[in-house]
Amino acid sequence: MKRILIIMAVLMMLCPDIYALTKKAEDSPAVQVLTSNKNARKLEGGMLKLARPALKKTPMAVVMDDIDMMVMYSISQKADEEEKQFAQQAINVLESYNKVSEIDDPDYRMSIYIDNPVGENFSEIILYTSRPDPSIMVFIGDFTIASLKKVGEISDQKRMERRRAKR
């Protein structure tokens, strides 16, 4: 009985620390991947967080809300030469801001471009997997419209070309 009481006392003493650690983890940068089968997958560097409902129809969505976060990408092995060059232009702009890291994971074979910057501190990144299955990464970061404008213009042209090709 004495041993049980000692163990309980030690656990009670540790509880505040455990709570503090949990709270700290909750405050860390949030990263979540929602796959087509609705399974959440944790990426390195953050706690899981629910993506916004507007992305329900997409096979995958990644949300990151840390101001100093990295954009993760991988250019598809299946992408044609034009798509690879296009993705590389977007990556070059992001790399100039030290905001990009490559994902070394076969599940993330996709090209990347920036679409629809909508505010000073918000932009959407569209990740295209092998057609016809697009995936969307949304991030909130400290990019400005000016830093994304060039790639945004390229993405607008590309989107129009894709629409014309579908007709």
Where are these regions (language model features)?
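Sec-dependent N-terminal signal peptides
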Residues: 4-13
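Sec/Tat signal peptide C-region and signal peptidase I cleavage site
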Residues: 15-22
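Early exported N-terminus immediately downstream of N-terminal targeting peptides
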Residues: 23-84
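C-terminal partner/receptor-binding element of secreted or periplasmic proteins
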Residues: 27, 141-167
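Extracytoplasmic
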Residues: 65-70, 105-109, 122
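Short Gly/Thr-rich strand-loop-strand
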Residues: 88-117, 163-166
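A short, solvent-exposed beta-edge/loop patch
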Residues: 113-148
